């Protein structure tokens, strides 16, 4: 199911989106936001927050920068990374322990090979 939705979003981005003018009020765009969530988080969480984002993308809301927030359990890796696709930025570092394990998901504009 996840692969199907990611494929549908990809088709929308490559085929349908170029045919109309850019209208998304947020960065990253709603389709990119959904793509990141479906790629890096739980299916139901991604579905809920993608729908919430799409419903907020109208003239009643201000818009702006809104990175997806994901929950991840990070285990240390002793060695250098081979490929960096995304950056995980802590939601509230060292201040709010209820936010422990929650990160902003920020896509690397250039894939970094180490």
UniProtKB/Swiss-Prot annotation:
Compartment annotation: Cell inner membrane
One Pfam short name: YidD
Organism whose genome encodes this protein: Wolinella succinogenes (strain ATCC 29543 / DSM 1740 / CCUG 13145 / JCM 31913 / LMG 7466 / NCTC 11488 / FDC 602W)
NCBIfam families tied to this protein: membrane protein insertion efficiency factor YidD
The keyword Cell membrane belongs to this UniProt entry's keyword annotation: yes
Membrane topology, record value: Peripheral membrane protein
Classification via InterPro entries: Membr_insert_effic_factor_YidD
Main location: membrane
Record protein name field: Putative membrane protein insertion efficiency factor
Function, as annotated: Could be involved in insertion of integral membrane proteins into the membrane.
Keywords on record: Cell inner membrane, Cell membrane, Membrane
Protein origin, superkingdom: Bacteria
Family: Belongs to the UPF0161 family.
Lineage summary: Bacteria, Pseudomonadati, Campylobacterota, Epsilonproteobacteria, Campylobacterales
One GO cellular component, as annotated: plasma membrane
């Amino acid at each position: 199911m996840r692969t199907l939705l990611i494929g549908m979003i990809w088709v929308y981005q490559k085929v349908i989106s170029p045919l109309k003018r850019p209208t998304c009020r947020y960065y990253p765009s709603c389709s990119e936001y959904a793509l990141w969530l479906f790629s890096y988080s739980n299916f139901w969480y991604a579905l809920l927050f993608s729908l919430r984002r799409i419903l907020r993308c109208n003239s009643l809301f201000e818009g702006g920068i809104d990175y997806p927030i994901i929950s991840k359990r990070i285990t240390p890796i002793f060695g250098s990374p081979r490929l960096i696709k995304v950056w995980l930025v802590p939601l509230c570092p060292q201040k709010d322990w209820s936010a422990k394990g929650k990160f902003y998901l920020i896509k690397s504009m250039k894939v970094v090979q180490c």
